[in-house]
Swiss-Prot record:
Keywords: Coiled coil, DNA-binding, Transcription, Transcription regulation. InterPro entries: GreA/GreB_C_sf, Tscrpt_elong_fac_GreA, Tscrpt_elong_fac_GreA/B, Tscrpt_elong_fac_GreA/B_C, Tscrpt_elong_fac_GreA/B_fam, Tscrpt_elong_fac_GreA/B_N, Tscrpt_elong_fac_GreA/B_N_sf. Belongs to the GreA/GreB family. This is Transcription elongation factor GreA. Residues 12-72 form a coiled coil.
Amino acid sequence: MVEKIPMTASGYKKLEDELSTLKVKRIDVIEEMRLAAMDKDMRENAPYHAAKEQRGQIEGRIKEIEHELKYADVSEYTDTNTSKVNMGSTVKLRDPKNGECCTYTLVSPKEIEPLKGKISASSPIGKAVFNRNKGEQIEIEVPSGTLQYIIEDISF
């Protein structure tokens, strides 16, 4: 049995868009191969071999995306579920010592974008806030010690 792949709705849509783009690109690469194959000497036909390699990479990524979409467990949460932090939640944390705040959105491991504040729900911060309520104090174990935060806000 294949495990479900946790994913947000936006992550699912992003994969669908990438799949559509790759299918169009595959057609273009096949045409490049056909044109390059018109040069009868296949042993030293660099454009043909480059296009063939590119097609293999595209085919591999298409299969990977199709697998992810087939087994995706898309998390859909609405504003009525904002009492607890879940997949897709945006959570604002406040450090009780200095009052500094930081904001993170919990996503699947395949959707992480640290520079945009998108972190994995299975990361140390993600695990610490998951299924917690607004106002709760959390502790996060890091190599340098323990960090404490208060959940200031939860949104979707």
